[in-house]
Amino acid sequence: MMIKPIFLILLIMMSSLAGCLGSVLPPDMDDSESRDSLVIAYEVKDDYENPDENPQVLSDFLSAKLDMDVTLYPIISEGAIIEALRFGHADIAFMDGAAAWMGWQQYELGVLAADQKDDGRTYYEAHAWVLNGSEMAEAYLDSDDSTDPFALLQGKTSCHTGWLKSAGMLLPMGYLIGNGYATVQGNSDDIASLRDTITGFFNDNANIPESGTPYYGYAGAVKCLSDETGDVAFAKDSTVAKYCGNENASYNEDWCLGMERYVKLPGFGKAPSHPIMYNPSKIDTTKAAKITAALLSLNDSPEGQEILSNVLNTPGLVETNAEDHLGSYGGLVQHIPGISTYFNDKYSIEN
């Protein structure tokens, strides 16, 4: 009889087919889709002489921590980062403070964390520096609330770090305009009006240096004050000590005065460090919390510390949010004439 052998053959064939079918995923899903993913917008170089500086090591670290497929999305500008986050091409990105503020204000991007500066802070303070004995210094030091050192800046010669620099121009001018000391001169929608606003409040000799000139940058602004070319220098809270307050005096600049000659007026506001941005409309709170925890874990291991140092150029990361990290900066620069249009053009953002 042939029935029994035929039955056995059919049984074997069905068993083999069942095994094959059991190992095949549905046609709309493959192995890569069984895990969540994370895309990081990052400016990637064509080649890295030091492999430890390659952001791929950051990607690999986060992939292991999150159990996600983490990839890099190459970008070439801050504007491209904003666009990538807006339209969901990338999930997170490390950004410049000014571009981050634009992304937050115009497109409701959020902040997960921020990098630390060498002193552990996630910001630096912008200040006006004057010389001891000046009427501005005396007004500040006299403990008399009726004497206002900022009002006394009117008509003086200012020393800025450069055109549209944060601590050297945007933050102090945003403060002076926003608090009614200075009045915008010209078209309030044109960034060029800021130059006339500066000379209108201070005087025509306001020092707004170009790159490569003697008074450019933080050192240049303090030099401008020190040699009395100007009456006030706008710089960071740490600037004077960096150039003129070293324990070994040979490290000080030759134009420095004694540290007791410099008086720091109250701060205008905070310039933020680089934040890690994301789009809350694309990433839910649970995933955002997981990503933040993985990023902060970089602080906790030798491997993570190497990535922080070599790839991100920071001693550490701190959890924060957009309001806390960008609010002080934005509250001041919003008073600068034409600033939104300027940033839109600078970062090539299409509305």
What are these regions (language model features)?
Residues 59-63, 125, 130-144, 249-320:
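Extended ligand-binding regions for polar small-molecule ligands
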Residues 58-66, 154-156, 166-215, 246-247, ...:
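Ligand-binding cleft/hinge of the Venus flytrap
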Residues 115-184:
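A conserved helix-loop-strand patch within extracytoplasmic ligand-binding domains
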Residues 94-108, 175-178, 218-259:
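A ligand-binding cleft/hinge motif common to bilobed small-molecule-binding domains
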Residues 34-40, 46-57, 283-351:
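An extracytoplasmic/periplasmic, membrane-proximal ligand-sensing/linker region
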Residues 35-101:
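Extracytoplasmic small-molecule ligand-binding "clamshell" domains
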Residues 1-29:
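Secretory targeting signatures
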Residues 72-83, 87, 96-99, 184-223, ...:
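Short helix-initiation/N-cap motifs at beta->coil->alpha
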